[in-house]
Amino acid sequence: MLERFFYYLLPTTYYLFIKHMALPRIKIAKDKAELVQRLLDEKRTTGMFSTYADVIAFAASLGVKHQRRSPVTEVSQSEPAPISLEVFISRGYERLIRLIAVVSTEDIKVLSSEAESAEAAILIFEEYANGGLEKLQQELRGAVDYTDRLVLILNAERFSQ
């Protein structure tokens, strides 16, 4: 599946990635690292997501929904460190990354086989994820149990439409 994704999305850089195994990494802002950790359901804590990739994908979707796009200025180097694109691909988020890029730019060229287009799509995804994490920080401030608060947020979103 990984090889098919790279061939489909990045045919000209496909062999470069496979040859050097230098897959791009999705960066997380240093000031959001603690929030991302707390959203992870590790040993039945306050989180409800299985992986960091799930947290970031949800945050990116939330960022798009609320039109919040914020650049990652300082990258977290500790837990969670930047996440390999391979993790997102294995979880099925490659389409989400491409969809967000196309919707954001309103230009199908972002799906081209050029390496710059792939980097642009990843950058857009990171920025929306950071914006979504900012929104989550505001919404979850003071919450003891993130699961209950996230359910309330999702229900409010559902009924507000």
What are the functions of these language-model segments?
Residues 48-74:
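Short, basic amphipathic alpha-helical segments that act as recognition/interaction helices
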